Structures are given as C-alpha cells and as structure tokens.
A protein has these predicted regions:
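Hydrophobic, Leu/Ile/Phe/Ala-enriched alpha-helical segments that form helix-helix packing faces
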Residues: 45-46, 98, 129-133, 206, ...
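Short amphipathic alpha-helix with an adjacent loop that forms part of the alpha/beta core around
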Residues: 121-136, 156-160
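Helix N-cap/coil-helix junction residues
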Residues: 51, 103-104, 134-136, 162
C-alpha cells in the first residue's frame, strides 16, 4: 500500500512548514509549482491510475503559476481543463503564462472569470461546468482552493451529476472541529485579502462530506490542501487517513501568519 505523503514534491522555499526539503523536491516553477508537495502526490496518483493525459476543473486558479496545483500536469503531461478565477487580472496573467510555455501544445483549455459559490446560479460550479462541457460528467481531477466556500461548492459538485476521480480541496488549518464558514461569508480574492481565519472548512468537515460521497482521504499537504480519491479507483492502492487525527492536519501557525490573521471564533457552522 502506497503512502502518498512520501511522494510530496513541489515546496516553495521559505514558504512551507516543512523544515527540511530535499533540493530536487523544491518548487522551481518549471518542474514543480505547488506550495506544500501537492505536485508530487498528484503525479504519483495518476501514474498508478495510468492516466497519462487527463482533464481537470481548477477552481481558484490564480495566475496558473505561483503555487498552482495543476500547472505541472499541464506543462509536463499535456492535461486539458477548465480554469476558474474571480480576479480577471490574475486570469489574464495565467493565460499569458500558458501561452509563453513552449512545452504546451495540443491542449484544450477553457477560462471562466467569476466566483464559485452556491449563492447565485451563475456562480454554481455545476452550471459553470455545463457552459463548457456538454455531455461530459466525469473529470480526472477537481481542485478547489478558493479561500471561502470550499465546503458548499464541493457539496454542490458531489450532489450533482458531475464526478471526479481525484479531488484536491483547500482546508482551514486553524480549526479542529467539524466546522465550515457559512455559505454567505465574505469571499477573499487573493492572499492579500486573507486578514482573518474566517474561510473554508476544517479538515474533519471536508473529510466527512467526502466520505459521504465515497471518497477517501489519501494525502494531507499541510497546512493547505486535502487530496481525496474516489474509493472505486483506490481499491486499497493508497493508504487512507482513517481515523483522521488532529495532529495530521492542524497547524498552530507561525508568527508571520498569526500576526496577519485575526482569529474568528464566532459564526462558524457545525457540520
């Protein structure tokens, strides 16, 4: 059985919580783009599943470069997909980054400039996907890192007619209970707007939701993302976080992070 955490590669130097990172595993923005090892985990999953060129939905793509969780799949393996980003300037830069990468050819990209939420029909992930993919219901990878409505958008996706083999979702490392920010909390656009911890959902809440729909938690790229695989495709290949322990996902934060972010204790929704 494979422990996927052993395959984490792609760490932003001086901006990850892992103190000792081998040089070949550091994010160099050519081989790796992720922040805390996500690139290596995804690479190993799709190697074992024998998916050489897949299709993704990338919710919260930023500039498709700095700490991107799909760029390596695109540039190295030629993946296709849908990029979703509310910041139009960031999305434009992302398009330029792809256009200037000589490794990318024969790919099919779609770009959507808008929010992801369940508050308006034009922001629902199922409606957005339907605007770009007709008849296609299963994707190889869904990523959601939007610093706001992760729980609600993931629930909307899973309860609809779309599915994914692998899901990467951003979580809130500061919460240990099974809680989420409410569906109508103020969204945060870009890292500069994250001045408190009132966003996304805790790892236990997201794990509970994913398990309900047949997904297993196979990697925690602490303190940013959880990676799940549909149990149909796991079949005992990858070690599962069962039971999920607080030490696996919780991070107390460093001085820089805690100074920038107010700790919000009220308003969380218990799941």
């Amino acid at each position: 059985m494979i422990n996927l955490d052993d395959y984490r590669c792609g760490y932003v130097e001086n901006h990850c919580i892992y103190n000792e990172v081998e040089d070949e595993k550091v994010t160099d923005f050519y081989n790796y783009y992720s922040q805390n090892g996500e690139d290596g985990v995804l690479e190993k999953i799709f190697e074992i599943l024998d998916i050489k060129k897949g299709t993704f939905v990338n919710g919260g793509c930023d500039d498709i470069h700095d700490i991107s969780n799909v760029r390596s799949l695109v540039s190295t393996y030629g993946w296709d997909g849908l990029f979703i980003e509310p910041n139009g300037s960031m999305l434009s830069v992302g398009k330029e980054n792809l256009e200037n990468d000589e490794r990318i050819n024969n790919t099919d990209f779609n770009f959507h400039n808008g929010f992801l939420s369940i508050n308006n029909d034009d922001e629902r992930i199922t409606d957005i996907i339907g605007d770009y993919y007709i008849g296609e219901t299963q994707f190889d990878l869904l990523t959601l890192h939007i610093d706001s409505y992760e729980y609600w958008v993931l629930e909307d996706f899973l309860s609809g007619h779309y599915d994914a083999k692998v899901i990467l979702v951003g979580y809130n490392f500061s919460k240990s209970g099974s809680v989420t920010a409410p569906k109508d909390c103020s969204p945060k656009i870009g890292h500069n707007q994250i001045n408190d911890n009132f966003f996304s959902a805790s790892a236990p809440a997201l794990n509970k939701l994913a398990k309900k729909y047949g997904f297993e938690l196979v990697s925690i790229c602490k303190p940013n993302n959880l990676i799940f695989i549909n149990q149909y495709y796991n079949e005992g290949r990858f070690k599962v976080y069962e039971p999920l322990k607080e030490e696996d996902y919780y991070w107390e934060g460093d001085k820089f992070t805690n100074k920038r972010r107010a700790n919000i204790t009220e308003g969380w929704v218990s799941i």
